[in-house]
Every structure is written in structure tokens, then in C-alpha cells.
Curated annotation (Swiss-Prot):
The gene is uppP. It comes from Bifidobacterium adolescentis (strain ATCC 15703 / DSM 20083 / NCTC 11814 / E194a). It catalyses: di-trans,octa-cis-undecaprenyl diphosphate + H2O = di-trans,octa-cis-undecaprenyl phosphate + phosphate + H(+). GO terms for cellular component: plasma membrane. It comes from the Bacteria. Keywords: Antibiotic resistance, Cell membrane, Cell shape, Cell wall biogenesis/degradation, Hydrolase, Membrane, Peptidoglycan synthesis, Transmembrane, Transmembrane helix. It is a multi-pass membrane protein. GO terms for molecular function: undecaprenyl-diphosphatase activity. This is Undecaprenyl-diphosphatase. InterPro entries: UppP. It is found in: Cell membrane. Its main location: membrane. The keyword Ribosomal protein does not apply. The chain crosses the membrane at residues 39-59, 93-113, 123-143, 197-217, 234-254, 265-285. Bacitracin is thought to be involved in the inhibition of peptidoglycan synthesis by sequestering undecaprenyl diphosphate, thereby reducing the pool of lipid carrier available.
Length: 294
């Protein structure tokens, strides 16, 4: 992978990360078409840090408020009882705990099934299958679910269900936002509330994965096993592109969901799956990673 190819993949990451279409699937598919090989889980995870930095910038006021309330409940002089520490009297404190709860499923699954996530689950036939399944689920759930619940009505149970939706995004094709939004809409959350929860809940998970993969990439490069990794210069540049373009996409996506349904995204997922299946059948794409020179 050369510098410009890495930059292009950073752009793809930014355009697809927040939409319920699976950025990891797009990176996997376009990487195969462009490079003849999977760009790899390490490169994908690291450039996702760029899009999450855009989320932090956009939601900075919410994040500062939530962190302030959460740390205040733990170390502040007031509210020493257990219920206060858990956010019984402060929604921001509670949201901090909800984000932690929602992060646990993907953290546990990511550690337990790391090898499968980085190999078996990146098979493009699996990607095709889940693109279709979650496309249909998103379409049906969004069309039939009520829009009554806001973020202020979230419960511990809801946070865990959101987290399970995020956990499923470890499979390329599910989509982190697609999983959480689908589960959120199924619980009756408004489209905008489901999106906001999806954005906030992804921050610790994506940063954690990015840092772990960065450490792993450093070890691989030092050992001479870089594979398709384009080098740190290209990877950092791709991450910056993902950050800048990603910020613009966040603004547009939030405006979109306040007016329109997710039907267009569901149709796109299904159409993409059909195209990828045809390319696999014709031998243009490879279902599993092909060893190629960096």
C-alpha cells in the first residue's frame, strides 16, 4: 500500500464510519479491489481513531459535562452514597456509567475472539451475508419502531442492549452505528437519540482498539512483519484525512436523520452486498486475505 492509497482509504473511512453501512466492510472491499489484499485490521483500527477524534470535537461539550459529572460523583465531596455515585440524581453521571456498560460487551468479545476478528470474520462472504441481514433489520425496525424515547430515558438495560449492538460490529458488514442504531430504534429511541448514543458509546471502544492495534503494528514493523501496513507516515496522514472529512460527515448525518428515515442506507447495504457477491463469483474479489507485497 502506497501513501496515496492509504489517504484514499482514510477518505473512505471518514465517509462511511458514521453511516450505518459499515466502514470496515468498505475498507475491506475497496482495499481488496485497489490492493489485491485486505488492508488489515491494524490499519483499519488506527485510522478509525481519526474519525473518533472528530466525534470528540463535535460532542466536546457533552463529553466534558459527562466526564465532569462522572468524576465528580466518584471523588467529589458531595454525594457519597452509592446511589449518588451511580448517577441516581444526575443524568450526566448516569450517562458516564451507561457508556462504560455499553463498552463492556465489545471489550470482552474483542479480547476473547481477537484472532477470529482479524482473520475468519473478515471473509467477504460473511461480510455480504451480514450486510444483507442488518440492512433488512435496519429497514424493518426503523419503519415499524416508535420514536418516543430520548437519551434522558435510557436505563441500565438499554445501555447493555446498545452495547450488544456495538459488539456485533466486530464483524465487518454489521456497522458500529448500524448495530447500535438498529437496537436503539428497536427499543423505541428516536433516530437522533440513537445516533447520539452510537457516537458517544463508540469513543472508548474505538480508541481502545486503535491503541492496541497501534502497539501491535509497532511490534510487527520492528519484527519485519509489516505486511500491507503502509508505514506510519501514510497511516497518520490517512488518520488526519479521516478526522477532517469525518467532522463534516457528522454534521450532515445528524441533519439527515432529523428529517429522513434509514431506508436509503438499508437499500444501499443490500445493493452493495449484491455487487460484492457478483465480484466474488467472478473472481474479481477474494473472500479471504491474499498475501501481497506492501
Amino acid at each position: 500500500m502506497n501513501f496515496f492509497q492509504a489517504i484514499f482509504l482514510g477518505l473512505v473511512q471518514a465517509l462511511t464510519e458514521y453511516l450505518p453501512v459499515s466502514s470496515s466492510a468498505h475498507i475491506r472491499i475497496i482495499g481488496d479491489l485497489m490492493l489485491g489484499s485486505d488492508p488489515g485490521a491494524a490499519f483499519t483500527a488506527i485510522i478509525q481513531i481519526g474519525t473518533e477524534l472528530a466525534v470528540i470535537l463535535y460532542f466536546r461539550h457533552d463529553i466534558i459535562r459527562i466526564l465532569g459529572a462522572w468524576f465528580g460523583s466518584l471523588f467529589g465531596k458531595e454525594g457519597k452514597d452509592f446511589k449518588s455515585r451511580m448517577g441516581a440524581h444526575n443524568r450526566d453521571t448516569q450517562m458516564g456509567w451507561f457508556i462504560i456498560i455499553g463498552t463492556l460487551p465489545i471489550l470482552i468479545a474483542g479480547l476473547l475472539f481477537k484472532d477470529a476478528i482479524e482473520s475468519t470474520l473478515r471473509n467477504l462472504w460473511i461480510t455480504v451475508t451480514v450486510l444483507i441481514i442488518f440492512g433488512i433489520l435496519l429497514w424493518v425496525v426503523d419503519a415499524r419502531a416508535k420514536q418516543v424515547k430520548t437519551m434522558d430515558e435510557m436505563t441500565w438495560k438499554d445501555a447493555l442492549i446498545f452495547g450488544i449492538g456495538q459488539m456485533l460490529a466486530l464483524i465487518p458488514g454489521v456497522s458500529r452505528s448500524g448495530g447500535t442504531i438498529t437496537f436503539g430504534r428497536a427499543m423505541g429511541y428516536t433516530r437522533e437519540a440513537a445516533v447520539r448514543v452510537s457516537f458517544l458509546m463508540a469513543i472508548p471502544a474505538v480508541f481502545g482498539a486503535g491503541i492496541l492495534e497501534a502497539v501491535s503494528a509497532v511490534k510487527d514493523v520492528a519484527a519485519g512483519n509489516a505486511g500491507m501496513f503502509p508505514g506510519w507516515g501514510a497511516t497518520i496522514a490517512a488518520t488526519i484525512v479521516a478526522f477532517v472529512v469525518g467532522y463534516v460527515v457528522i454534521i450532515g448525518f445528524l441533519k439527515f436523520v432529523s428529517t429522513f428515515s434509514y431506508k436509503a442506507f438499508a437499500i444501499y447495504r443490500i445493493a452493495l452486498a449484491v455487487v460484492v457477491a457478483l465480484l466474488l463469483i467472478c473472481g474479481v474479489l477474494h473472500p479471504t486475505e491474499v498475501v501481497a507485497a506492501a
